[in-house]
């Protein structure tokens, strides 16, 4: 390392964009980058790998007259905006106990408010302790809104009709209520005095550019005022995170590295994490994108650099990167001796995310360390136990783990595969053992699908157990339909309440035991179960005689014990009709001696 090692400087804040699908994340990113480029100011946007650096000088021109609202001189060099919006990129910007992202823009559709993935985004931002501001997007879609392209929101809103302003207030009020239900105080940014206590809502249009100056201004103001300590970096051995891995022609496997502290040079020894654990390698090349006007061909896209200083996005070329995983930390080692210590550090960090435990729980597979960590956190919040959390495709061993769980609790014998393949032998093994594999590219849908299956399986098990209990049932012997008067009695009945099946014991109104139903027939067809309203012939194994102990027109009742009645009313109530519950309560009164006969119907 050079002799300037240790000197400190203020680096650019790392900014990430999150929000629900179709809220306009990509359009907003494009607009922010495009606006900076369009100004053609000195020090305009620099394209990094996996990120864009927006210098404050270029943004100052975009913000125009609004800049005077920042009471102090802006000292941050600009923003490093991560190019890929959404959960997955953010999940990979991980570091122990938080995120390397310094601040986030949460994009919300003004017409739809907070949605499923918005709530997920808020959860993950809270979990990783990342401050955020809210871009309330698509104001150009508000009925009656007149667009003024690239104008600050505070100027554009004054030029709107009263009706459009009222509609905006109504929509913002709903979003403010939604945030309040999550424990956040929020308000339109130009009405906030203390940004540490109130969440800033910035109305914007990613299409027309309205509100973009305001958004950048709030971002700069917050970073400047509240993140200064966090943004102190030093010319020391670099620290970063692998955002993604990509095969490049002529280069092999390369890593997109987001460097958040220090410096990395060509030839440095680096330590990172892989599927098999921590490993070290030497940097062969550091690549940055060539300016468009310097590209000779699609292959001629990169410019080799000697060193990179934080904060930056860079393409790293090194041996063995095919073993690495996105979301893994990467540290520069100053000597071979330090490699061991850094490997241990990386191992400790990875083992907190990847694990295997001897517990009854699901098997979780994800494509990156970041998404695995996010998914494990999400499942824990949902109260779903985890046996295995790992990176990579679903393999036969995962099915074996799930099969072991099946022996103890089939409800958790499942594999959740996020953005990964299922190898053919694993697919065959899962089919053979009846292990469900849930595969999805959207996290909440993956968990939702498993929870739906879990509920359906639970319901089916409860229903199965319910079917085995003597059902609540009342039948009436139809006058003129006595086919045999003594054992076995054969009579025509109408099912007045519940359902009957063979094996159901019947009693009279005063509790006399008549016998069990042997068979149910309708027009010579034998039936297993019949429900309320059916008229069928039943045979009863009985010592009673029709005309003596039981007569035509009499009601017969299914005979349940007090314990069975309690179990039905407590555990299976949702499967019972109102009249079945009514019958069971009246049967309970009779069984407890509170009535002389069954008072039903």
Curated annotation (Swiss-Prot):
UniProt region (G5), positions on chain: 205-207
Keyword Nucleotide-binding applies: yes
Pfam families, per the entry: GTP_EFTU, GTP_EFTU_D4, IF-2
UniProt domain tr-type G: residue ranges: 10-227
GO terms under cellular component: cytoplasm
Described function: Function in general translation initiation by promoting the binding of the formylmethionine-tRNA to ribosomes. Seems to function along with eIF-2.
Protein name per Swiss-Prot or TrEMBL: Probable translation initiation factor IF-2
Taxonomic source organism: Thermofilum pendens (strain DSM 2475 / Hrk 5)
């Amino acid at each position: 390392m050079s002799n300037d090692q240790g000197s400190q400087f203020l680096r650019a804040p790392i900014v990430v964009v999150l929000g629900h699908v179709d809220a306009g994340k990509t359009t907003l990113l494009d607009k922010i980058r495009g606006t900076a480029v369009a100004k053609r100011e000195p020090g305009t946007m620099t394209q990094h790998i996996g990120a864009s650096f927006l210098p404050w000088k270029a943004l100052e021109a975009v913000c125009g007259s609004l800049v005077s609202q920042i009471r102090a001189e802006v000292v941050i060099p600009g923003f490093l905006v991560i190019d890929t919006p959404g959960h997955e990129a953010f999940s990979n910007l991980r570091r122990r106990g938080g995120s390397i992202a310094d601040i986030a823009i949460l994009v919300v559709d003004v017409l739809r408010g907070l949605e499923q993935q918005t709530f997920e985004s808020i959860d993950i931002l809270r979990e990783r302790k990342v401050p955020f501001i809210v871009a309330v997007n698509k104001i150009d879609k508000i009925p009656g809104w007149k667009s003024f392209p690239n104008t600050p929101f505070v100027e554009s809103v004054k030029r709107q009709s009263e009706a459009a302003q009222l509609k905006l207030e109504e929509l913002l009020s709903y979003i403010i209520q939604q945030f309040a239900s999550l424990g956040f105080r929020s308000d339109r940014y130009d009405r906030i005095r203390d940004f540490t206590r109130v969440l800033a809502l910035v109305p914007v249009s990613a299409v027309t550019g309205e509100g973009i100056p305001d958004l950048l201004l709030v971002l700069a103001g917050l970073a400047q005022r509240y993140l200064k300590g966090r943004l102190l970096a030093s010319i020391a051995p670099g620290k970063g995170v692998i955002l993604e891995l990509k095969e490049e022609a002529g280069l092999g496997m390369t890593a997109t590295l987001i460097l958040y502290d220090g410096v990395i040079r060509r030839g440095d020894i680096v330590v990172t994490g892989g599927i098999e654990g921590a490993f070290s390698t030497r940097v062969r090349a550091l690549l940055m994108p060539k300016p468009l006007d310097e590209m000779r061909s699609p292959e001629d896209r990169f410019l080799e650099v000697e060193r990179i200083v934080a904060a930056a996005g860079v393409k790293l070329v090194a041996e063995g990167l095919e073993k690495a995983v996105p979301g893994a930390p990467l540290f520069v080692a100053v000597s071979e001796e330090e490699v061991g210590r850094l490997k241990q550090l990386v191992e400790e960090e990875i083992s907190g995310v990847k694990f295997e435990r001897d517990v009854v729980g699901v098997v979780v597979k994800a494509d990156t360390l970041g998404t695995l960590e996010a998914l494990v956190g999400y499942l824990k919040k949902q109260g779903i136990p985890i046996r295995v959390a790992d990176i990579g495709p679903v393999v036969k061993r995962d099915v074996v783990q799930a099969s072991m769980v099946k022996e103890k609790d089939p409800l958790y014998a499942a594999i959740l595969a996020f953005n990964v393949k299922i190898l053919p032998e694993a697919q065959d093994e899962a089919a053979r053992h009846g292990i469900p594999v849930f595969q999805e590219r959207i996290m909440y849908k993956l968990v939702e699908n498993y929870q739906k299956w879990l509920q359906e399986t639970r319901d089916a098990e409860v229903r199965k157990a319910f079917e085995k209990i003597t059902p609540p049932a009342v039948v009436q012997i139809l006058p003129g339909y006595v086919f045999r008067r003594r054992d076995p009695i054969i009579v025509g009945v109408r099912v007045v309440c519940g359902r009957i099946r063979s094996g159901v014991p019947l009693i009279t109104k005063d509790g006399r035991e008549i016998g069990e139903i042997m068979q149910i027939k309708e027009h010579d067809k034998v039936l297993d179960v019949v429900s309320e309203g059916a008229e069928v012939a039943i045979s009863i194994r009985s010592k009673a005689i029709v005309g003596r102990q039981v007569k035509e027109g009499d009601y017969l009742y299914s005979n349940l014990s007090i314990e069975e009645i309690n179990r039905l009313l407590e555990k299976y109530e949702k499967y019972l009709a109102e009249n079945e519950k009514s019958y069971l309560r009246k049967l309970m009164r009779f069984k407890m001696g509170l009535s002389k006969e069954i008072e039903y119907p």
